[in-house]
Amino acid sequence: MTTQAPPTSLLPLSPEQLARLQAAVGEFSPTQMAWLSGYFWGMVNQQPGAVASPAVAAPPPVTVTLISASQTGNARRLAEQLRDDLLAAQLSVNLVNAGDYKFKQIAQERLLVVVASTQGEGEPAEEAVALHKFLFSKKAPKLSETAFAVFGLGDTSYEHFCQAGKDFDSKLAELGAQRLLDRVDADVEYQVQAQQWRQQVVATLQAKVPAQSTAPTQSTTPAAAAITSGGTTTVSPYSKTAPLTAQLSVQQKVTGRNSEKDVRHIEIDLGDSGLRYQPGDALGVWFDNDPALVEELLALLWLKGDEPVSIDGQNMPLAQALLSHLELTQNTTLIVDKYAALSRDETLIALLADKPALQLYAKNTPFVDMVRQAPSDLNADQLVGLLRPLTPRLYSIASSQAETENEVHITVGVVRYDIDGRARSGGASGYLADRLEVDGDIRVFIEHNDNFRLPANPETPVIMIGPGTGIAPFRAFMQQREVDGASGKNWLFFGNPHFTEDFLYQVEWQRYVKEGVLTRIDLAWSRDQAHKIYVQDKLREQGAELWNWIQQGAHIYVCGDANRMAKDVEQVLLDVVALHGAMDAEQADEYLSELRQARRYQRDVY
């Protein structure tokens, strides 16, 4: 922990007054100082015989600004917990979504706490992109009167672990702000670190800011609020930690038999649960690992599966822990490092010195295949200590309750690959496609995403860019726009390898076009000709018309791959704005940032 003097702005004295006071009291003894304190107290409280003085107004309460930069909801939930802690400690707090934060006011912040997640290749959460760009621009102000703390959320299975948190921490310090606490970089299993950090933040702020004598103020929004079809706000009893047990009603392959992709349309019956969602939200899916994978791992380690282990204080057989509580299909560099030490495998130990090769190995080699390639004799507790907790997967919702009512639809790309001749599949996608039977129970919850919403005005034009399974939320958008009778124009850009095999929801899109609900559709089939064509090529081709729609107030939505597609699409948008808007590169970038701030450029990328 780093301890520093509070900024002078937190005191009810100006720097000049503070300097004069410090100079004056230097010549007094402790006894004289004690007498003076009573003398000043008497002046303030107008005791008999005290020298009258003008009443001094109490300084306004110092508010802690708490910024949540969340991608999948974890940062938001942690920020909400910290907000509650600060309020309980009688401190005033303003919790704000990074996408709603007026970042030009950051120079006025005195106490700033940032909870930041990282997405893709070290990029900030989508809602924090504009703030991140501003802080790293020439317009960023000096922050010498600001004290701050940063908690970074990330995943060690990615190369740029917690990079967004590191960026915010280093840039705030570079701009002159003072650290209240050292930055925390937390992995997927972040709860223990988060609880300790919350306690440290509260204690540190209590030492710097007097508790409010009146009720502390807050500015925030409900955590689990959902909007019903009638427009009222409800609080759902279901969450990531308390999911709804629903039933699978439809599981259908929507790619052709000769397609290189296996994409499934999934429909889940929510029954009379009352679970509500909006177009743009995601569905969280809890899953069980493949029993065959569990048996394979146990056999490789010469374990029976009935060995007792403890998971979060709950005792259970090892086989049950591997099936339902521990991650088996994702590896990380940290796991490789620990396993190399236990196995003493020379190949793995040598790999640790080559960071790029280590990252690639962890990404492409599931834990069970690492054990097969580098055998070791682990006991049950050692195995459990190596593996990460199972986490749910999020899927963009492909339906609107205005049409499907008590159902929720998702579009799932099934992950399939071979390693050393052995077929492997993704944890959740394999569960949904291969192991979960129709009418079977499935645990789900809604992850609300207020950063991917249809425009409030039904007359506003909408541009949707979603290749592959990125088309999912736009199916929900079109269902909603049709039910609402929205008069605004709709334009879809979709792409996949082959027209005949990979045109997801083809009949539905054709109907929308025929009935005039979908104004335009541009399709990119990357493998149907000698040269590859992607959605970004179609965007560039339609640049002039695209600019016309933007000038008419269109909202732009992008869904799909964050690492390649989304970056390429953004570059084309910048090029279109520069060319047709007669701007240079810097002006185009600022223009796109303004669209993002106005919620006219929204992305759901992963």
Swiss-Prot record:
Biased composition (Low complexity): 212-234
Annotated positions binding FMN: 70-75, 117-120, 153-162
GO molecular function, one term: oxidoreductase activity
Binding site for NADP(+): 526-527, 532-536, 568
CDD domains xrefs: SiR
Free-text remark on how the cofactor is bound: Binds 1 FAD per subunit.
Pfam family, one: Flavodoxin_1
Keywords: Amino-acid biosynthesis, Cysteine biosynthesis, Electron transport, FAD, Flavoprotein, FMN, NADP, Oxidoreductase, Transport
Enzyme class: oxidoreductase
A GO-annotated cellular component: cytosol
GO biological process: cysteine biosynthetic process; hydrogen sulfide biosynthetic process; sulfate assimilation
Gene3D superfamilies given in the database record: 3.40.50.360, NADPH-cytochrome p450 Reductase, Chain A, domain 3 (1.20.990.10), Nucleotide-binding domain of ferredoxin-NADP reductase (FNR) module (3.40.50.80), Translation factors (2.40.30.10)
Cofactor(s) annotated in UniProt: FAD; FMN
Region (Disordered): 212-235
Residue span, Flavodoxin-like domain: 64-202
Residues in FAD-binding FR-type domain copies: 241-455
UniProt-listed InterPro entries: CysJ, CysJ-like_FAD-binding, CysJ_Proteobact, FAD-bd_FR_type, Flavdoxin-like, Flavodoxin/NO_synth, Flavoprot_Pyr_Nucl_cyt_Rdtase, Flavoprotein-like_sf
Assigned EC number: 1.8.1.2
Protein function: Component of the sulfite reductase complex that catalyzes the 6-electron reduction of sulfite to sulfide. This is one of several activities required for the biosynthesis of L-cysteine from sulfate. The flavoprotein component catalyzes the electron flow from NADPH -> FAD -> FMN to the hemoprotein component.
Family statement drawn from the similarity comment of this UniProt entry: Belongs to the NADPH-dependent sulphite reductase flavoprotein subunit CysJ family.
Quaternary structure and partners: Alpha(8)-beta(8). The alpha component is a flavoprotein, the beta component is a hemoprotein.
The protein's name: Sulfite reductase [NADPH] flavoprotein alpha-component
Name of the gene encoding the protein in the UniProt record: cysJ
